[in-house]
């Protein structure tokens, strides 16, 4: 069914892929991504595990209303989270050889 040494090779490849995935998961968790809103007036920097590292608010917004500022912060965080997801997909595609995951399955495992 697998040919000579086929099963052994397949197991070895699976182990190598698992090791690469583990290393990549650590790399992603430690990366930082910045999202912006209000044409860069609000910036939120988060890690690959979605922990907020920094929130930068332009001085000009301190005089505006509180609700608008809250909306801009939320939008900047959402932009950063979207960028993390995109980066994860790109990096994981390199490890999985572009193989698509089944629907509903998220990385890292």
Swiss-Prot record:
Gene3D superfamilies given in the database record: Nucleoid-associated protein YbaB-like domain
Domain of life: Bacteria
Gene Ontology cellular component list: bacterial nucleoid; cytosol
Region annotated Disordered, chain positions: 1-22, 88-109
Alphabetically ordered keywords of this record: Cytoplasm, DNA-binding
Subcellular location, principal: cytoplasm
Comp. bias intervals (Low complexity): 9-18
Family membership: Belongs to the YbaB/EbfC family.
Quaternary structure and partners: Homodimer.
Record's protein name: Nucleoid-associated protein VS_0917
């Amino acid at each position: 069914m697998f040919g000579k040494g086929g099963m052994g090779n397949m197991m070895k490849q699976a182990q190598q892929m698992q090791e690469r995935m583990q290393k990549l998961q650590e790399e992603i968790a430690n990366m930082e991504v910045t999202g912006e809103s209000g044409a860069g007036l609000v910036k939120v920097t988060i890690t690959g595990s979605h922990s907020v590292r920094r929130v930068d608010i332009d001085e000009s917004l301190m005089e505006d209303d509180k609700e608008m500022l809250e909306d801009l912060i939320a939008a900047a965080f959402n932009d950063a989270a979207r960028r993390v997801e995109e980066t994860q997909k790109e990096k994981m595609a390199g490890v999985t050889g572009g193989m698509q995951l089944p629907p509903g399955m998220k990385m890292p495992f």
